[in-house]
Amino acid sequence: MVTPLHNSRPRRVAVLSVHTSPLAQPGTGDAGGMNVYVLQSAIQMARRGVEVEIFTRATSSADAPVQEAAPGVLVRNVVAGPFEGLDKQDLPTQLCAFVAGVLREEARHEPGYYNLVHSHYWLSGQVGWLARDRWGVPLVHTAHTLAAVKNLSLAEGDTPEPAARQIGEQQVVAESDRLVANTTEESDQLVRHYGADPNRIDVVAPGADLTRYRPGDRDAARATLGLDPRETVVTFVGRIQPLKAPDVLLRAAAELIARDPASSLRVLVVGGPSGSGLARPDALIELASSLGIAARVTFLPPQAPDRLADVYRASDLVAVPSYSESFGLVAIEAQACGTPVIAANVGGLGVAVRSGETGLLVDGHRTEDWATALQSLVSEPARLAALAAEAPRHAENFSWEHTADGLLESYRMATVNYNYGHGPSEFSPRRGRGLWKLRRAGGVRA
């Protein structure tokens, strides 16, 4: 039997990140903001005396079984399926192998080695509730993205999330002892689309490494990147996929240049391939050429954090035109560096950006609207400077230290309400009730 924790703070947490490693380079493949979130929050929890072991699927034969990411933070690479060539959509076929690897590691230790499970993304949640039941400890889950929400705002030509994912998410929501949402809007989405109990949801905002992402010398940053100091640089940072909508920025830039051919606008695209449709960097290059702005667009591969900070500092404006974002770490990182953000008015971007104070939110994705919004900023240097001055002050509200504190409070709530030795308490979800909801919704047949 697992002994309850007297101070309600776990000694050691098993963090599950099945589909992407926290050590992977953000901006390519399936690596993005979630990778940064998992690693940075783990580092901060370790600094607070909580050991963290992150389980992820091995994607190379060269992956060591265990890697130390930071003091108190281990990454365990679980062999589950082929190392390469397995699409994220096919990962459910390897969850049994992944679960076996996780349970096998725990079995090497005395009972109670892990005090809590924290799963990230629905695939990890499927593993998480099995580990929770096996070990008799609470499960906390962070969705990061939700199929029901993504499918409501698909980019043209993008592939809808499959029904199997939404059913899987419904199960995880029903099974979790606590749910962590990035914003109150995401909390509302969990209730509205998945029937989550609002009393089990904790809103914990992601953060940024404010020691790394801070204002600096713009000319020096441009010299480092080989950018002309006389140009107006608008930057996109992220995976090149329809969801992130880099094409929206390119089309708006082309429209703006058509309106003002003497414009000094330069578009900087920083990221690697992912997803479907406009996922290949060369497809975006072809789009720039077809729009007649190839000479005005610079492409860079994903950048290491210190170099990425220079990218933000070198930019006059950072664009986040996504069709869906649960938060938008790029927006916070850019503002922390003193760079205003122009973003789509979707999801958590309404929290990450203070429209009119640290940047501008744009409704919809029409080329004309984005071009006009861009023009309103780049044509008014004084306005842009005022936004830039306020941006770092806003970003100070979002740090990984704050995120870790919020997560630890969620862990405390999960722990005090967990009925050790007897499974979930009356305040926690039960598997039967969750599946009953699914059957009533027609998602699962009895």
Swiss-Prot record:
<feature type="binding site">
    <location>
        <position position="312"/>
    </location>
    <ligand>
        <name>Mg(2+)</name>
    </ligand>
</feature>
<feature type="binding site">
    <location>
        <position position="33"/>
    </location>
    <ligand>
        <name>UDP-N-acetyl-alpha-D-glucosamine</name>
    </ligand>
</feature>
<comment type="subunit">
    <text>Homodimer.</text>
</comment>
<dbReference type="Pfam" id="PF00534">
    <property type="entry name" value="Glycos_transf_1"/>
</dbReference>
<feature type="binding site">
    <location>
        <position position="315"/>
    </location>
    <ligand>
        <name>Mg(2+)</name>
    </ligand>
</feature>
<feature type="binding site">
    <location>
        <position position="244"/>
    </location>
    <ligand>
        <name>UDP-N-acetyl-alpha-D-glucosamine</name>
    </ligand>
</feature>
<dbReference type="Pfam" id="PF13579">
    <property type="entry name" value="Glyco_trans_4_4"/>
</dbReference>
<feature type="binding site">
    <location>
        <position position="121"/>
    </location>
    <ligand>
        <name>1D-myo-inositol 3-phosphate</name>
    </ligand>
</feature>
<dbReference type="GO" id="GO:0008375">
    <property type="term" value="F:acetylglucosaminyltransferase activity"/>
</dbReference>
<feature type="binding site">
    <location>
        <position position="313"/>
    </location>
    <ligand>
        <name>Mg(2+)</name>
    </ligand>
</feature>
<dbReference type="GO" id="GO:0102710">
    <property type="term" value="F:D-inositol-3-phosphate glycosyltransferase activity"/>
</dbReference>
<feature type="binding site">
    <location>
        <position position="88"/>
    </location>
    <ligand>
        <name>1D-myo-inositol 3-phosphate</name>
    </ligand>
</feature>
<keyword id="KW-0460">Magnesium</keyword>
<feature type="binding site">
    <location>
        <position position="145"/>
    </location>
    <ligand>
        <name>1D-myo-inositol 3-phosphate</name>
    </ligand>
</feature>
<feature type="binding site">
    <location>
        <position position="165"/>
    </location>
    <ligand>
        <name>1D-myo-inositol 3-phosphate</name>
    </ligand>
</feature>
<feature type="binding site">
    <location>
        <position position="19"/>
    </location>
    <ligand>
        <name>1D-myo-inositol 3-phosphate</name>
    </ligand>
</feature>
<feature type="binding site">
    <location>
        <position position="239"/>
    </location>
    <ligand>
        <name>UDP-N-acetyl-alpha-D-glucosamine</name>
    </ligand>
</feature>
<keyword id="KW-0479">Metal-binding</keyword>
<feature type="binding site">
    <location>
        <position position="339"/>
    </location>
    <ligand>
        <name>Mg(2+)</name>
    </ligand>
</feature>
<feature type="binding site">
    <location>
        <position position="303"/>
    </location>
    <ligand>
        <name>UDP-N-acetyl-alpha-D-glucosamine</name>
    </ligand>
</feature>
<dbReference type="InterPro" id="IPR028098">
    <property type="entry name" value="Glyco_trans_4-like_N"/>
</dbReference>
<keyword id="KW-0808">Transferase</keyword>
<dbReference type="GO" id="GO:0010125">
    <property type="term" value="P:mycothiol biosynthetic process"/>
</dbReference>
<feature type="binding site">
    <location>
        <position position="325"/>
    </location>
    <ligand>
        <name>UDP-N-acetyl-alpha-D-glucosamine</name>
    </ligand>
</feature>
<keyword id="KW-0328">Glycosyltransferase</keyword>
<protein>
    <recommendedName>
        <fullName>D-inositol 3-phosphate glycosyltransferase</fullName>
        <ecNumber>2.4.1.250</ecNumber>
    </recommendedName>
</protein>
<feature type="binding site">
    <location>
        <begin position="25"/>
        <end position="26"/>
    </location>
    <ligand>
        <name>UDP-N-acetyl-alpha-D-glucosamine</name>
    </ligand>
</feature>
<feature type="binding site">
    <location>
        <begin position="30"/>
        <end position="35"/>
    </location>
    <ligand>
        <name>1D-myo-inositol 3-phosphate</name>
    </ligand>
</feature>
<dbReference type="InterPro" id="IPR017814">
    <property type="entry name" value="Mycothiol_biosynthesis_MshA"/>
</dbReference>
<comment type="similarity">
    <text>Belongs to the glycosyltransferase group 1 family. MshA subfamily.</text>
</comment>
<comment type="function">
    <text>Catalyzes the transfer of a N-acetyl-glucosamine moiety to 1D-myo-inositol 3-phosphate to produce 1D-myo-inositol 2-acetamido-2-deoxy-glucopyranoside 3-phosphate in the mycothiol biosynthesis pathway.</text>
</comment>
<dbReference type="InterPro" id="IPR001296">
    <property type="entry name" value="Glyco_trans_1"/>
</dbReference>
<feature type="binding site">
    <location>
        <position position="333"/>
    </location>
    <ligand>
        <name>UDP-N-acetyl-alpha-D-glucosamine</name>
    </ligand>
</feature>
<dbReference type="GO" id="GO:0000287">
    <property type="term" value="F:magnesium ion binding"/>
</dbReference>
